[in-house]
Amino acid sequence: MKIELFLVVIFALAIHMATAEEVIESDIEPAERGCIKSGQRCGSPHGLPSNCCDDWKYKGRCGCTMGVCTCGKNCPSRGCDYRTKG
């Protein structure tokens, strides 16, 4: 009886840990929930998508440049999602 109870507890803990890892992974990649805001990390160096929001403030380099989102009103649409303002 004790062995069966022990196995049930171990099985329940294994399920709990598996679901906890999924929650942690979903918090690591906020980019999947929408576009990435200007100044935040993006692109393959960080294992993230390159869909940057346009926050209408930055006037220099545009899109996902050197692993950071930089978008603004003077930027071409390269890598920036102009449908969603940051």
UniProtKB/Swiss-Prot annotation:
The modification Lysine amide is found at K85. Disulfide bonds join C35-C53, C42-C62, C52-C71, C64-C69. Residues 1-20 form the signal peptide. It comes from the Eukaryota. The keyword Lipid biosynthesis does not apply. GO terms for cellular component: extracellular region. Toxin active against S.frugiperda larvae. May act on sodium channels (Nav). Belongs to the neurotoxin 39 family. The presence of a 'disulfide through disulfide knot' structurally defines this protein as a knottin. This is U2-sicaritoxin-Li1b. It comes from Loxosceles intermedia (Brown spider). The lineage of its organism: Eukaryota, Metazoa, Ecdysozoa, Arthropoda, Chelicerata.
